[in-house]
Amino acid sequence: MAIHRHCDGLVRRDFLQLGLRGALGLGMCDLLRLQASAAAAPAGGAAKPVNCIMIWLDGGPSHFETFDPKPDAPDDIRGTFKTVPTSVPGVHFSEPVSKLAGIFDRFTVVRSICHKDPNHGGGNHYMMTGAPTPVPVGCGAFVTFHPSMGSMVSHERGVRSGLPPYMAMPANTRSGGPNFLGGEHSPFIVGGHPNSDGFRVHDVVLPGDLATGRASSRRELRGALDRMKRAHDRVVEDPAVEFDRFYEQGFDLVSSARAQEAFDLGREDAAVRERYGRNDMGQRMLLARRLVEVGVSWVTVNWGGWDHHGGIEAAYKGEMLQTL
């Protein structure tokens, strides 16, 4: 049977025997170690503060049915819906995004971005990284020839407030990886269903039946066992010696009131949760906001299902546009 090691030397079986891995956020350990390695040689120059939420509408919503209806174009080009005035005089949006039209004075629509790649794989890469693919790729390709924007922000900012600088939910985008920047700048994935009553973030939030006091007792037990192992590790120069520091960081993360509050959507006012939409995507938007408020530099909310080749009118009258 293969032995899978974590954090430079600790065997997975050791985690299970101590009953710690699922309870104390130890899935973060590798990421914390890698980020610390990267921080040992920071890039020159002072980093500018960046907190960004990228809402990635995978597949691409139609511009004609959202922000650029082209009401004066021929019938076979212009959008199928009526137009509505925005809060900026002279600018109109399509009817399905009428709520966004009312606050257009608070955001900007950039209509000059374009690329010449005819499929989703290459287009996704261009938008996520700012660079075209060096070779043609297929429509469904999951490739990253260059670091994604989130990974670049992670590289420049590093860990803030004990939380990873780059997160994605509920999964990474196809070109959202770090490439040559290294695995330490991959996103921490926040999966699950945040609209459910029992939602918690795997490897970060303590289970409801595990109080911090009990976790502390297990931490002390682990410390006693590791003191015996550490002497041997130092003799053989086992990298697992470094595990202690990252274990402590993982424990601090799950025991931090600030981190727990950010992930606990139950602390949010019920009326606010309703405004975001009581569905998984609406609650992911809310969680993203809470994460950047506590210091996460970049959060990507990956929202699929926007590749409408037909039935667009029915789709845009449904929940997707209401949530957006």
Region roles according to the model:
Residues M1-L324:
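Ligand-binding pockets and gating/stacking loops
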